[in-house]
């Protein structure tokens, strides 16, 4: 079996018709899934980026069924607002934008899950675990990670696979 199920927001509203379709699809899935199964949400950018509205997000948070959102808003005020909306619920916000990774963590996001965790997860892990205790170093690291993320558009995922092949963690760079 599975430990949890992550629902992709653009699949809950495939034609981007709005909240009515989103909620209808979500309700049918929730009725069919075991109530004990932890659920997540991912605002996957493909085939289109379907960000949750505040009402949709709050409903999911307050339902008690959802434990994680992979936020792809790329907008710190949105992450901050969602963290506030989720307070007191099981729902945790995980940011996926490297440019705001550290500020989002400081705002209460429960970590980072963007493309660059495929390159150097240990650096993001350190930032999450130790950053608040070593602010000067964390601030410098955050700048480095943000600047490094510019290379995301230079051939990902192939560039990550080449990197791991050179580290010896992958046998091939085939995509």
Name what the model sees in each region:
Residues 1, 90-93, 156, 165:
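Helix-coil boundary/capping segments in enzymes
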Residues 28-34, 44-154:
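Catalytic alpha/beta core domains of metabolic enzymes, predominantly
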Residues 160:
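Beta-strand-loop-alpha "switch" segments that mediate conformational coupling across diverse proteins
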Residues 1-51:
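Active-site beta->alpha loop and helix N-cap motifs at the rims of alpha/beta catalytic domains
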Residues 37-38, 90, 171:
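Secondary-structure boundary/capping signal
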Residues 143-144, 163-166:
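Short acidic/histidine-centered micro-motifs embedded in hydrophobic/aromatic stretches
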Residues 165-175:
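Flexible C-terminal active-site loop/helix
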């Amino acid at each position: 079996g599975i430990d949890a199920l992550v629902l992709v927001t653009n699949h809950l509203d495939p034609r981007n018709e709005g909240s009515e379709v989103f909620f209808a699809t979500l309700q049918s899935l929730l009725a069919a899934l075991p109530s004990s199964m932890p659920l997540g949400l991912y605002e996957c950018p493909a085939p289109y980026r379907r960000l949750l509205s505040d009402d949709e997000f709050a409903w999911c948070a307050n339902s008690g069924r959802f434990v994680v959102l992979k936020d792809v808003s790329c907008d710190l005020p949105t992450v901050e607002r969602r963290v506030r909306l989720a307070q007191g619920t099981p729902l945790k916000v995980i940011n996926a934008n490297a440019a705001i990774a550290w500020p989002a963590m400081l705002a209460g996001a429960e970590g980072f899950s963007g493309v660059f965790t495929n390159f150097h997860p240990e650096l993001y892990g350190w930032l999450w675990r130790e950053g608040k205790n070593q602010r000067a170093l964390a601030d410098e690291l955050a700048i480095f990670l943000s600047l490094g993320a510019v290379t995301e558009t230079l051939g990902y995922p192939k560039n990550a696979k080449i990197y791991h092949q050179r580290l010896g963690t992958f046998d091939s760079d085939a995509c």
